């Protein structure tokens, strides 16, 4: 017997029993961005490696450790996309979408990072993101946060997530703060863990995001970024907070929030939850006004966020919110004998045409009454439609409830669609 081939570690199948919850989440995401007037963009999953080195930053965990990179037959270095923003900017620059234009975009699709697989985090994961280009004011920052808050409300998890905010200032302000932070870290170099020592000069702001408890305690005395901000950056952040207050979105200012990607400036934010054990991020984003220019376009203000669908699905399952999912099948049509098969197929097709939203499954493969009823029950359908020789002779069909103890009833053939419509 040949050896069975299995999925690559960290790359999971989404099985038929799981897909209805995924479809529900995806439908909520699509309807929410549509309500705000955003347009979908779809980009390739394979890009030039240089795109991510220039956007994410070479001294980041993603580029150094996590990217799936390979050479193609032309010896070009290619990478499976680890996130969606860089690809969206590349597409915008390439097709002239961003030149003196405002764009409100969204995307959804698979991304790839060679991380240690764990529950809710996989090497192939599905990401949903929102990107806005051409608007540099705080009101658009507030809008994308309002949109994200709407997602939680629509999914029924708004009581289980909370918003954290910070501002990183502009590049010159951050450079001044960077120097002050390096000077502070140099004084305490012997107390830093290996990762923090490595990042101290190459990417010192990432030290603020350390998980090492000893370094976290040390950072309590570190310089505060807020003290290095100019009036324009302070006004931008205070306006954002004022707008969020006005629409009732609660938040906490977290001065240690810096995000893991190099391209952010000014506003950064995360939605976090404690419902998955230790505090975990379920959505993150911010402003990246320099990225479009960094990737060869004209300097363009931009803001956006991304979220991993696996984490959202896991959160819904953990909270028990995966129970009330519409069944894949509403009615299951059976034929009791070969002589009834043609009529059963006609009935199923007529139902689909008369009731386009109805999910109709026809029994195939023959079998006795017991086998067909077992299949009907397993399908999850609410009703079985039974066509036997007696029903055929009397121009009737039988409707059998599968999810309650109500009695089976006979209805006229031409009244079936109306009857089913009233029942479902």
Swiss-Prot record:
It is found in: Cytoplasm. SUPFAM superfamilies: Class II aaRS ABD-related, Class II aaRS and biotin synthetases. Keywords: Aminoacyl-tRNA synthetase, ATP-binding, Cytoplasm, Ligase, Nucleotide-binding, Protein biosynthesis. GO terms for molecular function: ATP binding; histidine-tRNA ligase activity. InterPro entries: aa-tRNA-synth_II, aa-tRNA-synth_II/BPL/LPL, Anticodon-bd, Anticodon-bd_dom_sf, His-tRNA-ligase, HisRS-like_core, HisRS/HisZ, HisRS_anticodon. One of its GO terms (biological process) is histidyl-tRNA aminoacylation. The keyword ATP-binding applies. Homodimer. This is Histidine--tRNA ligase. The gene is hisS.
């Amino acid at each position: 017997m040949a050896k069975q081939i299995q999925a690559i570690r960290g790359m999971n199948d989404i099985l038929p029993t799981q897909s209805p919850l995924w479809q529900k989440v995806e439908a909520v995401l699509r309807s929410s961005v549509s309500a705000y007037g955003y347009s979908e963009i779809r980009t390739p999953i394979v890009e030039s490696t240089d795109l991510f080195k220039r956007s994410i930053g070479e001294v980041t965990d993603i580029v150094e450790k996590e990217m799936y990179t390979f050479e193609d037959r032309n010896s070009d270095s290619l990478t499976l996309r680890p996130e969606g923003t860089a690809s969206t900017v590349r597409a915008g620059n390439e097709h002239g979408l961003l030149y003196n234009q405002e764009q409100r975009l969204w995307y959804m699709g698979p991304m790839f990072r060679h991380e240690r697989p764990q529950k809710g985090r996989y090497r192939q994961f599905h990401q949903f993101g929102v990107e806005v280009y051409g608007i540099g004011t705080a009101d658009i920052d507030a809008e994308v946060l309002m949109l994200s808050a709407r997602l939680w409300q629509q999914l029924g998890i708004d009581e289980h997530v909370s918003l954290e905010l910070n501002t990183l200032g502009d590049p010159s302000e951050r450079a001044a703060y960077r120097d002050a932070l390096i000077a502070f870290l140099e004084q305490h170099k012997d107390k830093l863990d290996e990762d923090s020592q490595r990042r101290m000069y190459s990417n010192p702001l990432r030290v603020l995001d350390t998980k090492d408890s000893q370094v976290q305690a040390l950072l309590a005395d570190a310089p505060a970024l807020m003290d290095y901000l100019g009036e324009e950056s302070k006004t931008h952040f205070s306006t954002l907070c004022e707008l969020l207050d006005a629409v009732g979105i609660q938040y906490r200012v977290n001065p240690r929030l810096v995000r893991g990607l190099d391209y952010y400036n000014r506003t950064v934010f995360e939605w976090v939850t404690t419902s998955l054990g230790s505090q975990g991020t379920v959505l993150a984003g911010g402003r990246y006004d320099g990225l479009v220019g960094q990737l060869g376009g004209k300097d363009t203000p931009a803001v956006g966020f991304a979220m991993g669908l696996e984490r959202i699905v896991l959160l819904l399952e953990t909270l028990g919110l995966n129970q009330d999912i519409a069944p894949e099948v509403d009615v299951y049509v059976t034929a009791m004998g070969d002589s009834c098969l043609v009529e059963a197929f006609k009935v199923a097709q007529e139902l689909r045409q008369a009731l386009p939203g109805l999910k109709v499954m026809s029994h195939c493969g023959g079998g006795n009454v017991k086998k067909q009823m077992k299949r009907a029950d397993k399908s999850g359908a609410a009703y079985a439609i039974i066509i036997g020789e007696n029903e055929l002779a009397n121009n009737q069909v039988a409707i059998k409830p599968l999810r309650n103890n109500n009695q089976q009833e006979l209805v006229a053939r031409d009244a079936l669609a109306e009857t089913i419509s009233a029942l479902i």
